[in-house]
Amino acid sequence: MLPLSPVLAQPLATAAASSMGTALWHALVLGVVQGLTEFLPISSTAHLKVVPLLLGWGDPGVAFTAVIQLGSIVAVLAYFRSDLQAVIRATATAMREGRWTDPSARLGVAIALGTLPIVLAGMALKLWFPGYEDSVIRGIPSIAIVSIVMASLLALSELVGSRRRQLSSVLPRDGLLVGLAQALALVPGVSRSGSTLTASLFDGWERAAAARLSFL
């Protein structure tokens, strides 16, 4: 292969550097959007879809959206590290002794069960709906409608929820309920924290306990 002449090499190098700079700038902006929206009951996935379109960047895609959420996961693990350590220790002790009276041990079971629905739903989407990324569900009209519906449900849960339950009363079925609500977040416009908070409030959880269960 003949080497490129200096006349051609310089413009190509400049274009590559410019493209890399643009990609990094886009990633930085979307990272800020993700960080600001992940911990509020609004869909970070929807904002990662809408903001680039408003700025004329196009859809970043499902893969980018999944990868950029790793920072939020690390932040959650760091913030709740003491809680998670207590849950792991209590669960290990309960498995060893066969007693599940410790609320932290029951919370460990609830967390494990709550992880299953979204994993199974994600696998099902991958296997049976290969065109999901380009489907109408990821369109702006669909995102707008879903966001309005979820906001209405969250407001309703505030009105009808008893807000009495605490984490000390957690049961395995609570984790499964939150997990099913979390699986809805695969639909753009459904906030993961919003859907899990809504389900917990409908189930009678106190606000702070509902938020803690949601993020754990």
Predicted features along the sequence, with ranges:
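Multi-pass membrane proteins that catalyze or facilitate reactions on polyprenyl-/lipid-phosphate substrates
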Residues: 1-216
